[in-house]
Amino acid sequence: MKNLFLTLLIITSVSFLNAQNKPQRKVQLALLIDASNSMDGLIEQAKSRLWAIVNEASSLTVNGVAPILEIAVYDFGNSGISDKNYVRLQTNFTSDLDVVSEKLFALRTNGGEEYCGAVIEKSLQELVWSRDPNDLLLIYIAGNEPFNQGPVNYKSICTIAKSRGVFINTIYCGEYQQGVKESWKDGATCSNGAYFNINSDAKIASTPTPYDDQIIQLNKSLNTTYLWFGEQGVMKKNNQIIEDKNAFNLGSGIASERALVKSKSAYNNASWDVVDAFQADSTKILELKDDQLPEELQGKGPEEKAEIINAQKEERAKIQAEIQDLSKQRAVFLSKVNRNPANAGVKDDFGTAVNKSMKEKAVLKGFN
């Protein structure tokens, strides 16, 4: 009996260690946004739905562990872009979600030629895609001109994407059948991706709830737990506030969605925030000189710094838990609103298209 117990203990320990040693899964989203003259509505939808998309991605798990989320942004079809095919990288894959928001809010439209094959080709060439077959790799391209325009054959690019395990998902801004005629459906199915059509001029309704004011106030308290460090720290801290305001200006509901993101592990700012960086590598932070640190940590010894940082960490965790609790109540409220017959038949928009297909493809990769 004793030997059996020891054997079971060893098997359990090995299984635990194997689970611990498995690398954290990744979800990589490349957003390719048509920025030609008629696409102002599309850009507004992308800005409005960013935090809903991030919340959906961060809810995916494998063995109870959330994935690392990385998002890249391109705009194309804008005549102000110097590239011969009117394609521009706004940000490579990044986990800095404030940067993603910043880039989306900076997008502007201008007349130009929309070459879908060219922007997909660029995204496959320039972005650092994961080579792990277990990771979820997704391209979302949205626009309203024929998919086969331009010098790059989308079919050949689609073959490359499929061979790398990248799903190309297409979002046509217009009538469903028109998108089919203009090859947007074929542009998706050729890589086993999903095809959607949306009304890009439809405004995203930010449904207010009784919980939004509390969540927004907690978000302000959450911001006080962030302590900058390094050359870009102050700028990054200021940008956090700017992106809060950008979300709030779109509606209290969207501000609440952003606050929920900030309560999760997906919102990690180890590149500029002392608390996140300390958790990743405490030695690095404790070795920084005073001119690289905020006033709260200047002139302090290692033990005192660690004490202050840990106190901030505990306060942050407490606020995040409160935001998550209120967000659950908010979700219940919204589910009741959405069950109302008056809200039946709501059509897809940029965000729902992304979230539907992301969930579908995630299941194929073993995510829950």
Where do the language-model regions lie?
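Divalent cation-coordinating acidic motifs and surrounding scaffolds
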Residues: 21-202, 209-212, 283-286, 290, ...
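A post-motif C-terminal structural segment
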Residues: 185-285
